[in-house]
Amino acid sequence: MMQFTSSYFRQVLLALCVAFALSSCVISRENVIVLERQGSFTAGGTVISTPGTFDSIADGAFSPADQSTAGQTLHGDHAFVFYQIPVDARPLPLVFWHGYGQSMKTWQTTPDGREGFQNIFLRQRYPVYLLDQPRRGQAGRSTEPTTISAATNDQLWFGIFRLGVGSELYPGVQFSPEPAALDQFYRQMTPDTGPLNIELNTKAVSALFDTIGPGILVTHSHSGGMGWLTALKNDNIMAIASYEPGSGFVFPEGEVPEPIPYVRGALRASAVSLEEFRRLTEIPIVIYYGDNIPNQPVENPGQDQWRASLTMAKAWRDVVNRRGGDVTLVHLPEVGLTGNTHFPMSDLNNLAVAELLSNWLKEKGLD
């Protein structure tokens, strides 16, 4: 009869462990995103200086209470860019620009822990560039001072971002009911570290496209209007996909619509020359809006301001298209996607939202 020693059992156990580990690796590799390269850089920016002479001996020690700035410079007001290039990448990258009070976190892991647009489109072999605009997030080095408020305003943004009213989620909303998800959502808000400067922001993002070449700009909310202005500056922007642009719509001189009133405010458009405006007729553009946006004025300001934005966006689409442009506006409930907040890219149905964009890119020959 064969005798089994403890050494024999150890060898068998080791072999089984190795086999299990290898099989696990094979299974998990199906979900691996393989990158050719990744990295980061800054784009745009300014340099300011203080007159005088810097004395590296007398003034070379860090002394916050009595620090001389004479003869020194400050590099700031740039965008910060993080990029990932997948293996066998598609030719045109997607450049993702966040909205007001946000950073590149908008496009990364969702508040409830699922993959965001960053990974979703990497899996589709698109090069992905995420940016923090000047004076925001990782681009916080500002050449102008500001005061950062510590106001308690979470519930204000809960309503404006159309998660619900007060602290109650809308019925059927595409946001996780788990308290931890809402906690994560609130914590992705981030302040401006300097005065908001539209021209500064658009120059920085234009410089980004100067660096990377042709690509597709994907904007959200406040960056929507800045996206149109950036396209006026840079022919490397081959298309724009805009999620819930809230303001900053530009029309040809003489065709600016009347302001659209909403609760406690009014949405105004601005004018550019017809020559500048024609640039927006030369590229395909798609605009997406989510749910819980009324057709008529309502008392809820968190909904009513988006009614004004959607109304203005429709007028803008019509003006661009009348001049030979190619603007598509998609109201998600009208195509069967209900419950979306102001953040469709991180909502529970973000895979379906991403599929709409993927299909549009293919339809326009941008894939």
What are these regions (language model features)?
Residues 98-110:
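Active-site glycine-rich loops that stabilize anionic/oxyanionic intermediates
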Residues 218-227:
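Gly/Ala-rich beta-loop-alpha elbow adjacent to hydrolase catalytic centers
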Residues 27-89:
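N-terminal cap/lid segment of alpha/beta-hydrolase-fold proteins
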Residues 195-216:
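Conserved acidic catalytic loop of the alpha/beta-hydrolase fold
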